[in-house]
């Protein structure tokens, strides 16, 4: 009998909406069972969604130009990957539906019995030439604009990006040092290369533009008219309205625009430097326009997996051309376009030289047979190659029909891979593994002398000299005599050695009521400690009595030449 306290029983009304949801859920689980590949793709999709949320938060919080550019770039890359992963998941689900229902795709093409092996595709030495005007590059005229550019590369659902490069008119081409590697590429791949750019406004370039504009207008229009124009500009700025003749600043960070793109296929693969055409998508009126020449130079290499990984191995008895004996018992390894024959299987693992090698190329002919007079090795596999007018045949003897079938399938798969990858199977192209990318480093800004001064009033002289010594980068001598004018203790003579210096006076100790000294990160002295006391900072060298008066600008020593 049904009891409310009985937790092991659940009743659902027949035909209710809840029952239909349960049935629909069971149908989905049984009909769309996710494969490990789909699970991995879903995990990547979830990761990119979290990365996009983090990039949005970072873009809303960052205040530096470099941070905003990197956050915007990350947001664009994450959005591209999310769209790519969602499209791939949708395609796989549709294929599952067609397979379960027994329907064929719209093109009604029979599925191939053999699918070509995948390979590694690497693009490196990327350079995009620029085409500046003569007045901009040679005569160095006009405003100096800067662009932040990067490349987005895609093969299927795999999307990679390069580091961001700052470009101005001092550069003749855009150079990317990254080696972009795609580990899972098919022979019919299409590598789409997209160049994105954003115009970078210099910080502080427009900060004083309203006041400078008002000053120029007031001086050019005369005293009376200029005063009225200046007053109107000041009132507009004080009322909170946008300054006249100045655009409203953009909200949401910088915007990257698609400047050019191209598509590279297997035909463009070459073990060398090559130039490809670019399709330009921006015009000169675009704020992110960059004077591109219309081409990209790069090295595109490909490594099919059949060329770098063994596809078959096992015990063989090889009878070479011209031999009348039963053959030599070897361990054969099919790798690339060669069948390597070793004495033992351990020799292949340790990388020793093979006993001999049988070449297998596109012109090789393979024929299977059976020998009645060899009961231990009854099955044969003949491999024939032509060298000019001569034909050389090597015969492989195998123990079982299953071994013969495995070697035949491996050879037919190799022939099929060579027909799909074509010239990439002639020789193994060199591909360097990309180095781990370092995080972008923001440009260090040196604080002014005002922000680096100490806060305690009794310690100002020591703080200033300490900062100047840190900027100069040299070890300064003991305190000069003029420092005694600001203290109660007489200055030490110049002949005193460091060992005879008296202990640190009481006034040099940190004050209990004062705020701690604050320095900028680039001017923090390395020898400051966090203990209760600190040593006297090195002071400037002594000066002659003549140098204690007024100085002209040309007589200042290097330790006083500090930007304020």
UniProtKB/Swiss-Prot annotation:
State what protein this is by name. Rhotekin
Q: Which GO terms describe its cellular component?
A: cytosol
- Tissue expression as described in the entry: Abundantly expressed in brain and kidney. Weakly expressed in lung, testis, skeletal muscle, heart and thymus.
The segment(s) forming the REM-1 domain are: 17-98
State the source organism's domain of life: Eukaryota
What is the annotated quaternary arrangement, including any partners? Answer: Interacts via its C-terminal region with the TAX1BP3 PDZ domain. This interaction facilitates Rho-mediated activation of the c-Fos serum response element (SRE). Interacts with SEPT9. Specifically binds to GTP-bound RHOA, RHOB and RHOC and inhibits their GTPase activity.
Q: Name one GO biological process term.
A: regulation of apoptotic process
- Which residue pairs form cystines in this protein? none
Q: Name one GO molecular function term.
A: small GTPase binding
Which SMART domains does the UniProt entry name for this protein? Hr1, PH
Q: Where is the PH domain?
A: 309-416
């Amino acid at each position: 009998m049904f009891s409310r306290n009985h937790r092991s029983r659940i009743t659902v009304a027949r035909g209710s909406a809840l029952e239909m949801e349960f049935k629909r859920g069971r149908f989905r689980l049984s009909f769309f069972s996710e494969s490990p590949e789909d699970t991995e793709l879903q995990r990547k999709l979830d990761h990119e969604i979290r990365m996009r949320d983090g990039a949005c938060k970072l873009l809303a919080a960052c205040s530096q130009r470099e941070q905003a550019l990197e956050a915007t770039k990350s947001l664009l890359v994450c959005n591209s990957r999310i769209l790519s992963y969602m499209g791939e998941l949708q395609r796989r689900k549709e294929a599952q539906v067609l397979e379960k229902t027994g329907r064929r795709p719209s093109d009604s093409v029979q599925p191939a019995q053999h699918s070509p092996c995948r390979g590694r595709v690497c693009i490196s030495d990327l350079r995009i030439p620029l085409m500046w005007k003569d007045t901009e590059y040679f005569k160095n005229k006009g405003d100096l604009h800067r662009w932040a550019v990067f490349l987005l590369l895609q093969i299927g659902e795999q999307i990679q990006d390069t580091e961001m490069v700052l470009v101005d008119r001092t550069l003749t081409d855009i150079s990317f040092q990254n080696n972009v590697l795609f580990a899972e590429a098919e022979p019919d791949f299409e590598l789409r290369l997209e160049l994105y750019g954003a115009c970078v406004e210099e910080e502080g370039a427009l900060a004083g533009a309203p006041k400078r504009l008002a000053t120029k207008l007031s001086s050019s229009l005369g005293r009376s008219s200029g005063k009225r124009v200046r007053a109107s500009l000041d009132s507009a700025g004080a009322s909170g309205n946008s300054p006249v003749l100045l655009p409203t600043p953009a909200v949401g960070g910088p915007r990257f625009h698609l400047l050019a793109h191209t598509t590279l296929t297997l035909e463009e693969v070459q073990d060398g430097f090559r130039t490809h055409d670019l399709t330009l998508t921006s015009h000169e009126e675009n704020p992110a326009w960059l004077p591109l020449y219309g081409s990209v130079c790069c090295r595109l290499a490909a490594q099919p997996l059949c060329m770098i990984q063994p596809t078959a191995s096992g015990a063989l008895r090889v009878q070479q051309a011209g031999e009348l004996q039963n053959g030599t018992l070897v361990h054969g390894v099919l790798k690339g376009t060669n069948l390597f024959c070793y004495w033992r299987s351990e020799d292949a693992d340790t990388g020793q030289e093979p006993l001999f090698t049988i070449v297998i190329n596109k012109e090789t002919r393979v024929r299977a047979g059976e020998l009645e007079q060899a009961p231990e090795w009854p099955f044969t596999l003949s491999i024939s190659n032509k060298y000019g007018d001569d034909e050389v045949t090597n015969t492989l003897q195998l123990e079982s029909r299953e071994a013969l079938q495995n070697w035949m399938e491996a050879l037919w798969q190799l022939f099929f891979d060579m027909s799909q990858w074509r010239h990439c199977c002639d020789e193994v192209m060199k591909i360097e593994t990309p180095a781990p990318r370092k995080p972008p480093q923001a440009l260090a800004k040196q604080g002014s002398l005002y922000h680096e001064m100490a806060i305690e009033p009794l310690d100002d002289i020591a703080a200033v000299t300490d900062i100047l010594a840190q900027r100069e980068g040299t070890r300064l001598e003991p305190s000069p005599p003029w420092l005694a004018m600001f203290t109660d203790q007489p200055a030490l003579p110049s002949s005193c050695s460091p060992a005879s210096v008296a202990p640190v006076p009481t006034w040099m100790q940190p004050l209990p009521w004062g705020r701690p000294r604050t320095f900028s990160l680039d001017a923090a002295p390395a020898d400051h400690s966090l203990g209760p006391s600190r040593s006297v900072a090195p002071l400037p060298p002594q000066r002659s009595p003549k140098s204690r008066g007024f100085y002209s600008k040309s007589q200042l020593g290097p330790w006083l030449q500090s930007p304020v």
